Amino acid sequence: MSNFWLAVVSAQHVRQGVEFGIVQTNHGKPQGIRRMSPGDGLVYYSPKTSYPDGEPLKAFTAVGRIADGEPWQSDVENFKPWRRKVHYDLSTDVSLAELQPQLEFTQEANWGYQLRRGVVPITEHDFALIRQAITSTTA
């Protein structure tokens, strides 16, 4: 059985992850990606264009499925982030406001607090809704 995840990452970092076919969350810490398994669905929500001082974006920016294999620790100039391989779909950014009334994870009054964890589980309904919206607008 697949799980479905929402990762909170700046759009700039999402684009880099898509380019390299990887997921990296929570500033490279392993906890979030260790919860993911091959076949799990992954959606990115980007509150800003870049971290830490980017412009507000509040959009879903990528979607994919976790690939086979285990997380590994990369070594990038004194930075050793944990990563996993991902098969990304072609997608276009879609604003949170456009989908919010239909999303289950936004129905609680303080739903935004959970996003501070960086990686949160979402329902299959929310994953499918977001995936359909951001992949249907690509050429």
From Swiss-Prot:
Disulfide bonds: none annotated. This is UPF0310 protein RSal33209_2865. It comes from Renibacterium salmoninarum (strain ATCC 33209 / DSM 20767 / JCM 11484 / NBRC 15589 / NCIMB 2235). HAMAP family: UPF0310. Pfam families: EVE. Belongs to the UPF0310 family. It comes from the Bacteria. InterPro entries: EVE_domain (IPR002740), PUA-like_sf (IPR015947), UPF0310 (IPR022996).
